Every structure is written in C-alpha cells, then in structure tokens.
C-alpha cells in the first residue's frame, strides 16, 4: 500500500509496530522484486527515512544515482532525516564521497554543455532544461554533503544557495571551509563560490570529449518526452546534420514531438514521420508555442519549461471579439487566462480598474482560492486568450 498515496502515511505508521529489521528486509525485497515500479520505489525511500539503521543508509545509497534525479532527490532528503535522528556516529563524508563526486561531475558536464550552446531563440528551452537539471543536482549534492553535519546552517540555506541569492553566502563558505576535507571542497566550491570558477583547461577537455552534437543526439533519444522534443526541435531549426545521426528506434512518440514533426521537411532526413503521427485535434498554438508564451508571464517565468509544458497541455487558446465578455463578477472561478493578443478591460460596476495587454494574467486568484470572480473581464478589442482550467 505504500505506492497508494491515500494509504502511505497510514502504512508507515503500521510498519512502525513491527520489528524494524524485518520491515527493512521486506522493503529491500520489494525494491528488488519491483525494480520498474518508480512510485513504489519513491515511497519506500521515504518510508526508510524513519529508520536510522546503518543498513538503511546502504540501501538508500544504492539508489542515489545521477541518471534518476527524481529518485535521488527523495534519497537525499531521506538520508538527511536519518542523519538528524541518529545517535550513533557514521562517516558520512567518506562513505558518500564517490557519490558526491559523481553528481558534481554530472553538474560540471551540464555546465560545459550550456557553454557550448549559442545564445539564440532555438536554444532557449535547452538552456532552460540544463539550468533546471543543474539546480536539482546541486540540491542533491548539498543535501548529501550536509549529512556530515546534519544540524548545520547549510540545510536551511540550500534554496538560496541554489538560486544564487543568499546574503549569508560568505559565512556559509567559511563554515564549509572549516568543516569539510579539501577533496570535498574542491568538488563543491566551483558550484557555489562565485570567485572559484572551473578551470578553462578542464572545460575545454570536457567540450572535446562531449561535443555539442553528442549532447543533442543523446537528449533527442531520451525517454523523457520534453528533453527529446526540445532537442529534435533544435535540430530542425538549427542543425539538421544531427537529425540523421539520431537512432529513431530509441525516440518515443509523444504529443509534443508529434507537433514538432507535423510540418517538418523530411527531404534528405531519416525521420520515420509515420511513427510520430498523432491524431489529435488541431490547435491554434502547439505545446511548445504555448510554453514559450507562458514563460513570458510573470506568474510562470521562473517555472522550468518541462513543468510548464504540462500546463500547456491542459490549456486552450480562444478568440474573443471586441466587447465580448470573458467572465462576470460573481461567476464561478474555475479557470485563469493569459492574454496572448489584444487588450482586456477589468471592470467593477461601471468603473474600469485595469487594462491588460499581452503577457498579463487574469482570474488566477479565483482559481487559487475557489472564490467567485470579483470583477468583470471584457475584450477591449479582438483578442486571443489562453485558458487554463483548474
């Protein structure tokens, strides 16, 4: 029942009534028997956080891998909970050094990948995805590093360190320098200390070993729909030579990619277009186009494109004629809108209280608090709005 979100907490409480060694053994068996059940694996990792046994640390470490960020985030969080609740000492820094090294190397590789990309519109989503993955890797690294001193100030500063806006960073850096070994600091500092950058020679070596084309090819063949779609979209717009190097048998058909390939010129390429034909209704904007539009809105600009694409898939663009009402004061607030084109007048009674144009959002408060609309919204001219349902 651990994988059933409705039963998870209750199941954990019941398991606490049994001998912890038996529980740990059975959970480990489940991990082995149901390797492909990702939801179960996540919940077992969360469940194991309630046991401070050395065996649990070993089990979780095995699932802390660079090729599965989602599981690794949960593993790092569970390990920190264990470290905070342990009374016995454990050599966390030495035991997890190789793990930290693997994650910092992956972070560095992504850093080099980003450097190799040109600064233009066709690389926007790839850079956005790299930034997203780098932030998540850094989160895992800082959580695992903190295991050595679990009640240190590092944990409470992780979010700000990742966002590069921690006012206390000088004190955090000083704390790290006095608390960790030189080999750990050598891995950590280039990621968080603005004055301690990666050496240019090291970057150039990495770029030689993993050139841009190999990254784009690997991402195109990824089983992650978003990464695959944005990489193939990049190839079509910027570098068609990569297209013929892609192993299309590895590329998974998905709605985003189907739209990317829908009107592409297949001449001189090896793209098996029939594999990616998706019988969906025609839309005014593709998922990628809607995601780009959402990224221009203040409300969504800090959300990674991969997550925003999920919002794009449940949104619809709609035309409104000049003078047409979008919603009235008192209507049920079951959706929000983004202005894509035109102008929208927000009125209360006979008074205009706001005039919204491209990029503005409206109706979001009613969506969040389930209250009725508190004003009227009327198209001031012919407009196109993106409607996002609850």
Enumerate the predicted regions with their spans.
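Structural detector for internal amphipathic alpha-helices that build alpha-solenoid repeat scaffolds
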Residues: 1, 7-20, 29, 39-53, ...
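Amphipathic alpha-helical scaffolding segments comprising HEAT/armadillo-like alpha-solenoid repeats
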Residues: 1-2, 20-34, 53-65, 84-101, ...
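Short inter-helical turns and helix N-cap capping residues of alpha-solenoid HEAT/ARM repeat scaffolds
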Residues: 3-7, 34-37, 67-71, 134, ...
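Alpha-helical adaptor scaffolds
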Residues: 191-225, 229
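Eukaryotic acidic, Ser/Thr-rich intrinsically disordered low-complexity regions
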Residues: 247-285
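A small-molecule sensor/coupling module
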Residues: 281-293, 307-310, 372-373, 380, ...
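Regulatory nucleotide-sensing modules
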Residues: 288-349, 356-360
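Cyclic-nucleotide recognition modules
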Residues: 352-390
């Amino acid at each position: 029942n651990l994988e059933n979100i409705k039963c998870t907490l209750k199941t954990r409480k019941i398991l606490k009534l049994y001998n912890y060694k038996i529980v740990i053994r059975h959970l480990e068996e489940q991990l082995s028997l149901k390797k492909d059940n990702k939801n179960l694996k996540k919940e077992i990792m969360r469940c194991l956080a309630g046991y401070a046994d050395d065996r649990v640390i070993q089990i979780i470490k095995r699932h802390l891998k660079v090729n599965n960020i989602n599981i690794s985030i949960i593993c790092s969080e569970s390990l920190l909970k264990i470290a905070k609740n342990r009374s016995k000492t454990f050599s966390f820094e030495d035991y997890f050094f190789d793990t930290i090294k693997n994650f910092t190397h992956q972070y560095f590789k992504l850093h080099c990948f980003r450097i190799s990309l040109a600064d233009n519109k066709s690389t926007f989503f790839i850079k956005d995805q790299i930034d997203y993955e780098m932030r998540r890797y850094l989160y895992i690294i800082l959580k695992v590093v903190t295991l050595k001193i679990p009640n240190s100030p590092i944990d409470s500063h992780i979010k700000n360190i990742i966002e590069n806006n921690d006012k206390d960073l000088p004190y955090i850096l000083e704390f790290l320098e006095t608390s960790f070994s030189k080999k750990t600091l050598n891995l950590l500092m280039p990621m968080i200390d603005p004055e301690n950058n990666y050496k240019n020679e090291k970057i150039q070596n990495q770029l030689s070993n993993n050139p841009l084309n190999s990254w784009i090819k690997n991402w195109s063949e990824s089983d992650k729909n978003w990464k695959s779609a944005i990489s193939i979209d990049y190839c079509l717009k910027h570098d068609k030579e990569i297209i013929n190097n892609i192993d299309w048998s590895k590329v998974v058909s998905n709605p985003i990619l189907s739209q990317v390939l829908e009107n592409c010129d297949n001449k001189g390429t090896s793209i098996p277009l029939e594999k990616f034909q998706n019988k969906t209704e025609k839309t005014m904007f593709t998922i990628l186009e809607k995601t780009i539009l959402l990224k221009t809105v203040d409300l969504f600009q800090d959300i990674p494109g991969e997550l925003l694409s999920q919002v794009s898939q449940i949104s619809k663009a709609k035309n409104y004629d000049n003078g047409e009402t979008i919603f009235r004061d008192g209507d049920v607030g079951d959706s929000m809108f983004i202005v894509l084109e035109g102008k929208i007048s927000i009125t209360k009674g006979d008074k205009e209280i706001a005039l919204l144009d491209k990029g503005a959002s409206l109706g979001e408060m009613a969506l969040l608090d389930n209250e009725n609309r508190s004003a009227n919204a009327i198209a001031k001219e012919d407009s196109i709005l993106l409607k996002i349902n609850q």
